[in-house]
Every structure is written in C-alpha cells, then in structure tokens.
Design a protein with these regions (language model features):
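Conserved N-terminal catalytic core of the sugar/cofactor nucleotidyltransferase
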Residues: 2-5, 13, 31-121
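Cofactor-binding loop segments of dinucleotide-utilizing enzymes, especially the Rossmann-like FAD-
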Residues: 8, 54, 127, 156, ...
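Conserved beta-loop-beta/alpha segment of the NTase-like Rossmann-fold superfamily
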Residues: 70-72, 80-171, 207, 214-215
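Catalytic-core segments of class I nucleotidyltransferases/pyrophosphorylases
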Residues: 142-146, 175-274
Length: 280
C-alpha cells in the first residue's frame, strides 16, 4: 500500500514563521514535522510515499535527498554520529513528489496522487499532523481496512466548542473503537455538529475516492473538501484513536508536541521539568 502526504498548504496561521519555510518543516523537538509523518508511514509497513508539494516547498525535497556536501564535511570533521543521522534520513523510504499547481483544497490535492496510486487502495497522512501511540495510527486503519475492504478514517474526541476547527462525523458505534460513518461535515459550528468525533488526519481510501472527488463541488471556503467527497462513498468506517494528536498549524499544539517528545529524552527531561516548574 502506498502513502500520500499532502504538504502544499501555505500555513498562514503560523505566519511569520512560515513566510520562508514550509509549515511541514517546522521543527518539533529535534526533527521537522514531516519527518515524524514519514516515520509513521514506515512503521505502518509503508515504504512507497508520495508527497504533494507546492511553491516554496523545495526544502522538503532537499531534506529527504542526499546531501553530498554536508556528508563530506561531516566525514572530514570526524562527526560520525551526525553523519549517520543524515544518511539515515536519505534511506528512510522511496519518496516521490508531485506539485499541486492550484491550492483548491485537500480533495484537489489528493487528486494529484491518482496516477501514482494506480487504482490501488492508499493511505493519506496530513503533513502537518503528528500522531503518537504504541500502535501507529495508520496501522490501526490498515488492519481494519484489510478486514472490511472499505475506506477507513481515523477519528478522535474533541471538545464540543472546537468542532468548528475539524471535519466532524455522524457515526454509529459497531464495536469498541470501530464506527460506521453515516455522514461527515466540514468545520461545523458547535450547535450544528452531529457529534464531537473529529477526523484525525489519517485515512485508508479505496481508488473510487478519486471519482467521488471529481463529482464534488467546491464547499467550505470555496475549496474541494475531502470530507464532502468521502460522504459520497457507499460505505465508510472510522477507528477511534486514543493516542496523542498534534496539529502543528495550531500554535499551542505545536508547542506541546516539542515538549511531549523532549520528555522522552533522558538528557533533557529533568532540566525541562525544572524550567516549566519555574513558571508555576
């Protein structure tokens, strides 16, 4: 199964930090955001990855590409630890790129992947969203997809007053964390939201999704919304995710994500805790 990572958005909510660099390249503790997304795909058993980029996104390609000058400098300086880290990035996966020429929404971005997907089921990872859990979020979806052979999305609970920031689902619980999706609404007001279950930013989709996108008129913000296209599918399942989700375009979640990863580092944990306590 192939992975598609949309990463063409401008990141306007993070300006001025994103004026000269993609939001997907903003650092989360020690690595760029999109590095964690690619790692999740790999840990879910996927090594064929298509990243959908746009203007001013060249640094994403440069990051995953081989850097001969940097490797030569590190080798000459005897910095073997850093040389190993740099080479590991290049060898992560087979990554291809395609440009979304016009930013017409997530649905339109996914259409850019149709030729690469070549009629097979595929996964979608939003390039500005990081998930953390014992079992990768996408792996949970793939397992459900392999059982039902129907498009499957990740969902999670969000505060009722935050539904206007997410795609929200109307669903029926089948068993445990498994839901049958009845309808999807893009960023509804709290009073109009069918639930507080939001789409997490991870999907396993069948190839007929492309037909549904082509049949979808521009919706919220005048963009072709993936949620509108998914609502046209005959059958759609949701898996409730219970791990951590960090939407990097939300400033507080971006800050929390770095703290979350830093707390796993024995070298800095105690100093970080002491620093945060100084504000209490």
């Amino acid at each position: 199964m192939k992975a598609v990572i949309p990463a063409a958005g401008l990141g306007t909510r993070l300006l001025p930090a994103t004026k000269a660099q993609p939001k997907e390249m903003l650092p989360v503790y020690s690595k760029p955001t999109i590095h964690y997304v690619v790692e999740e795909a790999i840990n879910s058993g996927i090594d064929d990855i298509l990243i959908i980029t746009g203007r001013n996104k060249r640094s994403i390609e440069d990051y995953f590409d081989k850097s001969y000058e940097l490797e030569f400098m590190l080798q000459k300086a005897g910095k073997d630890r850093y040389l190993k880290q740099v080479r590991k990035i290049t060898d992560l996966a087979d990554i291809c790129y395609v440009r979304q020429k016009n930013l017409k929404g997530l649905g339109d971005a996914i259409l850019s992947a149709e030729r690469h997907v070549d009629g097979e089921p595929f996964t979608v990872f939003l390039g500005d969203s990081i998930t953390r859990s014992e079992v990768p979020c996408a792996k949970e979806l793939i397992d459900v997809f392999n059982k039902y052979k129907k498009s499957t999305i990740s969902i999670r609970e969000v505060p009722k007053d935050k539904t206007c920031s997410y795609g929200i689902v109307d669903s029926t619980n089948i068993d445990g964390n498994l839901y049958k999706i009845n309808d999807l609404v893009e960023k509804p007001k709290a009073s109009q939201a069918p639930s507080n279950l939001a789409i997490t930013g991870r999907y396993v989709l069948t190839a007929d999704t492309f037909d549904k996108i082509n049949q979808t008129e521009p919706g919220f913000n005048g963009e072709v919304q993936l949620t509108d296209a998914l609502s046209k599918l005959d059958e759609l399942y949701g898996v409730k995710f219970t791990g951590n989700v960090f939407n990097i375009e939300n400033r507080i979640e971006w800050l929390k994500s770095s703290i979350d990863f830093a707390m796993d580092d024995d070298e800095f944990r105690d100093d970080l805790i002491g620093y945060m306590k100084s504000f209490l």
